[in-house]
Amino acid sequence: MKINLKNKRALIGGSSKGLGYAVAKQLAACGAEVTLVSRNESLLKKNIIELKELTGCDHNYLLVDYNNSKDYKKIIDEFFKTNKIDILINNTQGPPAGDVLNVAESDYEQTFNLLFQNTVNTSMAAIKGMKENNWGRIINMTSVSVKEPLSYLALSNTIRSAVTSWGKTLSIESGKYNITVNNILTGFFNTERLNQLNEEKAKKFNIKTSEVFEKMSEMVPLKRIGEPEEFAYLIAFLSSEYSSYINGVNIPIDGGLLKSM
């Protein structure tokens, strides 16, 4: 089985680094024309050069700040006035870590805009062209915490659950246009974000960061943290024709971390 995404255009959120950029590289390697989305222009420019060297094709980027949802919507709407895409990967940076008892009301509002509203706005803008083409893939990168909340991630646990519910609802309504919508429940992956969270947790509990990683790895039946490339393979499959009958599901990729069925 060879995944061929030639003549497909993909918009990939949060793709200056981490899981987002791993996905961008994999989709580009499969033949897609990708548009990277991030607020870090220096990294975006660097990545575009790397993708050109990897694929021999031109790719693009969109400079946005997810933390300003109003400006983000304006930029996204402007982009889709002249562009259509086939594949949308909804992904943003994560919200601040913290315990539920210490979260302010304003934090919920900010995280709602960051994780939920940006996802809705991007999807609604993208889906118009997908309907015209009678083909589309929308993939929401969420977290295993929507099924089993993780400690010290109150904001993420709460708002990502709304994203997955919304994604399921969208899948019901968009299926007749041959557009699939799926949610990826992400486990522990070797990224800068995970390093940051573990450093914060180490300070909070006065232990070494290496101990946090060791305990985290022990929680996973495979006894290790995942690599971004492993995540990207799943996204490439879901973006392809091979996934044409997979719709409206929450797919964990976590090394067996979730205990639920």
Predicted feature residues:
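Short C-terminal tail/terminal secondary-structure segment
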Residues: 4, 18, 148, 236, ...
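Conserved glycine-rich cofactor-binding loop
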Residues: 9, 16-18
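Conserved glycine-rich Rossmann-like NAD(P)H-binding loop of the short-chain dehydrogenase/reductase
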Residues: 30-46
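Substrate-binding pocket helix/loop in short-chain dehydrogenase/reductase
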Residues: 99-112, 138, 216
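Alpha-helical segment proximal to the catalytic Tyr-Lys
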Residues: 128, 172-173, 244
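Catalytic loop of short-chain dehydrogenase/reductase
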Residues: 139-163, 167-176, 188-189
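Short, small/polar-rich loop/turn modules that mediate ligand/substrate recognition or access, typified
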Residues: 175, 180, 246-248
